[in-house]
């Protein structure tokens, strides 16, 4: 990804005064970008290629099957690694990709709950996400631009499906005229281990999920 390199959030007016910034003057709680070429301003020349693509370079799976004394268990694990997920789909030129995470700083659109709950505010000065703004007004519209702030390692491991069953002994079933009886419970997507915020499906982190 070609993005700006983020350096956390601005935490004071003094920090803003002594930093380079992009576009209009930022506010406390906005994302701070690094001036990579040292020219005293943040522009397209400060973008650099960082991280990996958004498709796993490595995918893997594991199927387990076991049986004992009438009980049987099967499970399917899937996973992916060596890829990055961007929590924003807004590019440096303002073009919006088709992801729900794009919409956090767009007027009339929704923001993910994790972002709202952890955004910088006066009441929450230690917030880990930038302050929320109305539409694209002021520097807040720049917080959604593609930068390392929004890149996350997409690796994950998921229990895709599991089934637990029990087959009743024939000696129990024959007297009631039943040849074979098996009961089971089954589940899908039972748990996922990943470093992404809650609500993002690492298999397809897009607008349709």
Predicted features by range, described:
Residues 68-70, 79-83, 161, 168, ...:
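Transmembrane beta-strands of outer-membrane beta-barrel pores
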Residues 75, 183-185:
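Membrane-embedded beta-strand positions of outer-membrane beta-barrel proteins
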Residues 192, 196-209:
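Predominantly the C-terminal beta-signal and adjacent terminal strand-loop region
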Residues 61-63, 161-165, 209:
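Membrane-embedded beta-strand positions in outer-membrane beta-barrel channels/transporters
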Residues 9-28, 80-177, 181-182:
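Extracytoplasmic gating/loop element in the C-terminal half of outer-membrane beta-barrel translocons
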Residues 35, 39, 43:
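Acidic carboxylate motifs that coordinate Ca2+ or other divalent cations, activating on Asp/Glu
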Residues 70-74, 171-172:
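Repeated loop/turn-to-beta-strand initiation elements of outer-membrane beta-barrel proteins
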Residues 52-57, 149-158, 209:
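Short sequence motifs at beta-strands and strand-loop junctions characteristic
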């Amino acid at each position: 990804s070609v993005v700006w390199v983020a350096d956390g959030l601005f935490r004071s007016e003094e920090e803003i005064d002594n930093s380079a910034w992009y576009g209009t003057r930022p506010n406390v709680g906005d994302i701070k970008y690094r001036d990579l070429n040292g020219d005293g301003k943040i522009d397209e020349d400060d973008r650099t290629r960082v991280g990996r693509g958004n498709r796993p370079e490595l995918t893997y799976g594991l199927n387990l099957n076991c049986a004992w004394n009438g009980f049987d268990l099967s499970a399917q694990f899937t996973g992916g690694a060596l890829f990055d997920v961007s929590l924003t789909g807004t590019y440096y030129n303002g073009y919006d990709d088709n992801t729900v995470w794009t919409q956090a700083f767009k007027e009339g659109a929704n923001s993910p709950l994790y972002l709202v709950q952890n955004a910088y505010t006066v009441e929450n000065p230690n917030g880990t996400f930038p302050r929320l703004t109305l539409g694209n007004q002021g520097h807040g519209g720049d917080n959604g631009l593609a930068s390392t702030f929004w890149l996350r390692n997409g690796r994950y491991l998921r229990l895709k499906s599991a089934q637990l069953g029990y087959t009743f002994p024939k000696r129990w079933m024959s007297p009631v005229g039943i040849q074979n009886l098996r009961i089971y419970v089954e589940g899908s997507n039972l748990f996922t281990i990943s470093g992404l915020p809650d609500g993002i499906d690492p298999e397809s982190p897009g607008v349709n999920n």
